[in-house]
Curated annotation (Swiss-Prot):
The gene is dgkA. InterPro entries: DAGK (IPR000829), DAGK_prok (IPR033718), DAGK_sf (IPR036945). Its cofactor is Mg(2+). One of its GO terms (cellular component) is plasma membrane. It comes from Sinorhizobium sp. It comes from the Bacteria. This is Diacylglycerol kinase.
């Protein structure tokens, strides 16, 4: 069995046959749920989740349009994805390079910057909808 047809899960000692068809779909969904559970363990993600809930409450108060809710949800999903990638980068760097290195620091800083960009985008958009579209109208 070649390397591209194997998947390793925690606790397994050898290669496992890759699932195909509908089993692959369920396996992929299981891995995604595992990633979501892992992401909930990150304090930064929990803070972002609270901020999203606050934005949704503010959108309700100002009477945001359906499009504005959809745009905010898309921005939040992007932020979740970037937070997941950033967490993966941090875990890989910590595993591969437990000592402090410039390359590891750069990788972590770049992942963090990507998250910051989306946090700012989410905040600016939410503020625009609430302040300019909501209270100014």
């Amino acid at each position: 069995m070649d390397a591209k047809n194997t998947t390793h899960r925690i606790g397994q000692t050898g290669p496992v046959e890759k699932q195909t068809g509908i089993r692959h779909l369920f396996a992929a969904a299981s891995y995604s749920l595992g990633g979501a559970k892992r992401l909930i363990g990150e304090a930064a993600f929990r803070h972002e989740l609270i901020a999203f809930a606050a934005a949704m409450i503010a959108f309700i108060i100002v009477g945001a349009t359906f499009f504005q809710y959809v745009a905010m949800a898309i921005l939040f999903l992007l932020m979740m994805a970037f937070e997941a990638i950033n967490t993966a980068i941090e875990e890989i760097v910590d595993r591969v390079s437990p000592e402090i290195s410039e390359m590891g620091k750069n990788a972590k800083d770049l992942g963090s910057f990507a998250c910051l960009c989306l946090i700012v985008a989410n905040g600016v958009y939410a503020a625009y909808v609430v302040i300019f579209d909501g209270f100014m109208n």
